[in-house]
């Protein structure tokens, strides 16, 4: 078997008949499969053992040789080789065809490769192949030319004979007529009888004339056809062809069927044809040139590589190994068989019948019919249903052909090569494991035992609990007591992988250390639920076991959940308290006025209350019942760092652990701060979710991951503890309807009535009335909402849950306690009747129905969205899968400019809202300099939160940062241009598959994006596409619906306002030609512009526009932006437009991910003029190849090629990849393979998919060559130490090195272990 590590490219080409015969182990001659009585394969049949190998290991067919000792012998009785049965998976046979057939892929594919090569229209080609027309294969021009005059004379003689014969016949008939009429006259017949006779005679003469004329025309046709006869000419009329053959058979040869195609190919001169086509392209115009270009692609492909076009016509058909098309016996003696066997049987039957007919010398028409049937059966075998009706099996189901085995989700590529089932895995329901640490999961004992079975068995043998593996296996199966102890030992520090489907991003698989638990459910840490998107309502998860030491190390270092706290999409923590935990911490840090034991100044009667010397003392007061944790107290703290301002005031030198200071706070907040690292400044405020997030964010920026992991774990424990004690529950009695509601409703009812009356009077039309009502009821809903919020008391659990940020929002509470408000119909328009009741009061029947309208739409939407979003992710992964970080720095000076703040008129700075997703986590491309010329942050520095703060303080508004859009690395990107990895907060590693991370980051929130197209204020008509469809439209580079024109030049606008259309003319500043935009529909509004004086208004006559500015509302066409503004601008345009959609849904994704995808969309150049290069004009080529070829040509002193960048949609870009394996496994498998085979494509195995398909390690992460080829070489000292012979006095053997040898615990503090992070 071929070892995948010993080849580094894979080529596909056309197989010739010779190749097919060389692969084959014998010819399949009979359609028989298995003898139903003996259940043994028939000789020479589709399962023949002589051809494909024995069905049983080391046993021949007749049983003469059994046992392995006869290995390699070929039995002389039955001819079967004695070998393993698994050769039946790899040995092929073949069928020798009695007549050649064409390969349907090359004839019927679009475009038809055979048609392009032979310059025949596909319709004509079909007529030839399926025996509907003859084609002229060769003409002996010379002989015809020499003998033309003789032949012409012969033809004239023949025509004269026909004419003479006609004249003689007519003469005779005319005489007979005269005689007849004379006779009738003599008899005195009536005139009508005479007329009848006369008419009859004339009719016969007319027929004679016509018959002769037809004969003459026929001769003319034969003669003109013959004189103009040329190769590749079709003759559909069979009689004409027969005549030609009879008369002039020696001057030409003609044929039909695939044989004729084969003959045409034999005489086809590829080099001459290619030269002709190149000449046509140089001199031709229009359609002719286009056709020549298309044909040259195919012709040049055959010219460039050693493929012979003869491979498109087959003389032999390969038969795939029988194990790949098995036949199994069912209960009841029937057989279930693969469809391929049926298709092969049809081919063999027809082939054998054709052989017999040829041997019998059957008439041509019968033989041709049989040949046509053979051609059709081979077509069905290769690609059933491609031409005509598909061949069906029992129950009218189309049979699955060889092409169908490759195609689609169930095909070979996607089902078996890219997605495999793995052993050492299991799945079970998940339950919550609040007692676990962040890096642990609970694994059911039985599951663990089954997963770790081989390890347990080995260990049992090592420990002498079992004599051999067999008895160890028996012990494990009987679950003896020792087994559990060994299992505990084996699983220690052996991480397992947990995965929850759908795995939308890389955090859908994480590694945990297993803890054995009773029961059958996997226990999951509550903080990782967000990353897995898991909940405990019956979700299931799969467990996988990394086996090798390397796999375990990678799982532990890269995938352990405590190393995956940050989201790869935005770089913000994902593992943070949510739901109950948030409520608990919110409750803990609350400050209640007037609570038991709160701080009170001393009075005459009482001393000062609520002052404590330490948190411990305050805790005692709580235990005594004299204080509650929410009460305000004054307490002296020594183990917590004071906030920045207090630290600066009290400890100018800086605070040290143990320095005391007093704080006015609550005990709850002190307890909360004890959960944070000791040197984190004290946080003295209430903790809703947002605030908790900022703290964890901050920790992630400033502390090692391990500290963050420990902290979130502590927060989780405290959160659950205090959530329990907060007593937050939700009951219907907690839902309080505000008493002011009735009054509010009344006033708004009155306003609505007014509108209604105006409408009745005809003062408003329907649209105006609807928008007025929508406005009124939106206000009413807001009013009720405000009244409801004000009416809820502080200790009510419902607003507490919402305010803490644990779950829900005020809109949902408003539906419960206020009023539901306006709802939409399925079109997305507001229904002007609101739902006035709240859920607590109960809805009326009508309200219930209009409410279900929107709800049902929502559910349907969600279902569609999930599928769409999954498909988007798949396309994104495919287009970006080979973007891998290849080097540290490509050394480019280029970058993009991002805004970090805006200066206001009063000189103050407003931080840009999108710094987090645009500038953060990048590398500076140029020094950031303030107004005085001081360098604040130098070039090449990483922009984290501290650096950005420094820039803002210095008053810098824009910085130039490195970006993957400007990276000059050939394949992939460089680490400096990419910036830091969002998931680790450090510069991205070489080998990181940033393309796939980008695709997952964009695809994972896809399901949250809406489907709907939004209506502008209830106006039907041109909708603005939003949500997921808009993202797809952008990534597929489609022309948007309702596209807006952009200014081709800078200049003054002249606006003409027609009755249905606008007409905009731009007069360029440089005095060039005017640009006119005509027929701009009034349904689209004019664009709002910011003017120099700071005001905003619609575009008007006389305004000045800059090049590339949009003139109307709507979306600009990216192809236009590319044409007018160039590639850099279109990239930035696409990134911003995609971000628009995600931001509108509150999803935070870093720009760099979108940039990675957009970079892939602009990888190609279309060739305009090929210069001295090999490129064909009009072809697409990689930018890197284009530039390399031009450099080479210029160095040789030639003319470089000219090209222009093209923007390709992600689907098209994926299919246009250099790797045919990757493209074939994506979409349109047969088309990709057809194309690759003709071009003899070679796959260099650079991307990830190709390597997964052939089973190599992917060239990313630790699979990249620079990591695979590392060898460890010890230094001299290490060598000396390794081979040193210890003596007795150097303490090597004495235990004093570490601790006393008394067996007591070792006091670690004596050894100076750091206590920074205790």
Swiss-Prot record:
The keyword Transferase applies. Keywords: DNA-directed RNA polymerase, Magnesium, Metal-binding, Nucleotidyltransferase, Transcription, Transferase, Zinc. InterPro entries: DNA-dir_RpoC_beta_prime, DNA-dir_RpoC_beta_prime_bact, RNA_pol_asu, RNA_pol_N, RNA_pol_Rpb1_1, RNA_pol_Rpb1_3, RNA_pol_Rpb1_3_sf, RNA_pol_Rpb1_4. Zn(2+) 2 binds at residues 890, 967, 974, 977. It catalyses: RNA(n) + a ribonucleoside 5'-triphosphate = RNA(n+1) + diphosphate. Transmembrane segments: none annotated. Binds 1 Mg(2+) ion per subunit. Zn(2+) 1 binds at residues 60, 62, 75, 78. GO terms for cellular component: DNA-directed RNA polymerase complex. SMART domains: RPOLA_N (SM00663). Mg(2+) binds at residues 535, 537, 539. Its EC number is 2.7.7.6. Belongs to the RNA polymerase beta' chain family. DNA-dependent RNA polymerase catalyzes the transcription of DNA into RNA using the four ribonucleoside triphosphates as substrates. This is DNA-directed RNA polymerase subunit beta'. The lineage of its organism: Bacteria, Bacillati, Actinomycetota, Actinomycetes, Mycobacteriales.
